[in-house]
Amino acid sequence: MTKFLGPIAGFGVTFSTMFKKANTEFYPEEKTPTAPRYHGRHQLNRYADGLEKCIGCELCAWACPADAIFVEGADNTDEERYSPGERYGRVYQINYLRCIGCGLCIEACPTRALTMTNEYEMADDNRAGLIYEKDRLLAPLESGMVDSPHPMAPGTTAEDYYRGTVTGGAAPASQDEPEADDTAGDRP
């Protein structure tokens, strides 16, 4: 008897789901918000004055199981300072054809320079377009930030940056550049 009721019970499940309302998502017209901790596109963060947080240590590249990250560090100079430390990431590439979105690179970063955003629309018809360079990964400049290279904020050290005590604002002009004079004689 149970031999005959088994298939009927299976058809009962199928029959009951036939009359349920379909859960249709109207993507891409209506985009549903992602979870706050969603692993989307990577972002290279900046300090409050615009200097880059990446110190070019290459720990993210070593931690990546898919070998999707390439970092080449370089030394900062007093003339060209990209980060508050001795080094910065001169070349930074993430190959999204290889990235598996695991987030191990985020955990490996000692300065929290690398985070993941909620952006997930990265499709491209060109394979080369899915290799993101540093210019596409850097966080956009906010108000009060100055694009690097520029000197550190006056009176601060690299430790002040790492502790988070540096606030936004442009670094003062160097002594080599003359300051603008607001007198009427300077205007054409």
UniProtKB/Swiss-Prot annotation:
Its main location: membrane. GO terms for molecular function: 4 iron, 4 sulfur cluster binding; iron ion binding; NADH:ubiquinone reductase (non-electrogenic) activity; quinone binding. Residues 144-188 are annotated as: Disordered. Its EC number is 7.1.1.-. It is found in: Cell membrane. One of its GO terms (cellular component) is plasma membrane. It is an enzyme of class 7 (translocase). One of its GO terms (biological process) is aerobic respiration. It comes from the Bacteria. It is a peripheral membrane protein. It holds the Pfam family Fer4_7. HAMAP family: NDH1_NuoI. PANTHER family: NADH DEHYDROGENASE [UBIQUINONE] IRON-SULFUR PROTEIN 8, MITOCHONDRIAL, NADH DEHYDROGENASE UBIQUINONE IRON-SULFUR PROTEIN 8, MITOCHONDRIAL. NDH-1 is composed of 14 different subunits. Subunits NuoA, H, J, K, L, M, N constitute the membrane sector of the complex. Belongs to the complex I 23 kDa subunit family. NDH-1 shuttles electrons from NADH, via FMN and iron-sulfur (Fe-S) centers, to quinones in the respiratory chain. The immediate electron acceptor for the enzyme in this species is believed to be ubiquinone. Couples the redox reaction to proton translocation (for every two electrons transferred, four hydrogen ions are translocated across the cytoplasmic membrane), and thus conserves the redox energy in a proton gradient. This is NADH-quinone oxidoreductase subunit I. It comes from Rhodococcus opacus (strain B4). The lineage of its organism: Bacteria, Bacillati, Actinomycetota, Actinomycetes, Mycobacteriales. The gene is nuoI.
